[in-house]
Amino acid sequence: MYHCEICGAKADIHHIVHKHEGGYDIKLNYKYLCNYHHRGKIGPHNCIETDIKYKLEMQKKLFKLLPKDYYTAKELYGLLEITNSLLKKLVKNLKLYKEGYSKEEIIANLMGGKLYSYNILQEIELERLYHNINIG
């Protein structure tokens, strides 16, 4: 049984990069959340800030896990704790350079095809403030 990473209640697996966004079914893409913290008002399915925050956390972990600029498929298999079939899916979308697969491309692919910036959170907050001013 899984426990919510926030409150400790019974939890389900949340895919940080959702499957429909191109997310992989790997441990690094999991966050264990109870129903409230998963699908509630402040959960990643209903709160864009929470969703982006979790994606930024995952992306930061990936950059820490992959400090080199290039990796072989064998290295990725071990570091990402990924199945052979998911590894094949990952590398088929990547260009193989003479040095190996590019860290930036690997991470972007695992993040659903893009890299996230902390500026996104600021833009969302500014947009929300602007919207509230225009309504009020």
Question: Which residues does each PLM region occupy?
Answer:
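Short cysteine-rich loop/turn motifs with clustered Cys
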Residues: 1-12, 34-36
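Short Cys/His-rich "knuckle" micro-motifs
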Residues: 11-17, 42-47
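Short linker/helix segments within small regulatory modules
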Residues: 17-30
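Helix-turn-helix DNA-binding helix
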Residues: 87-88
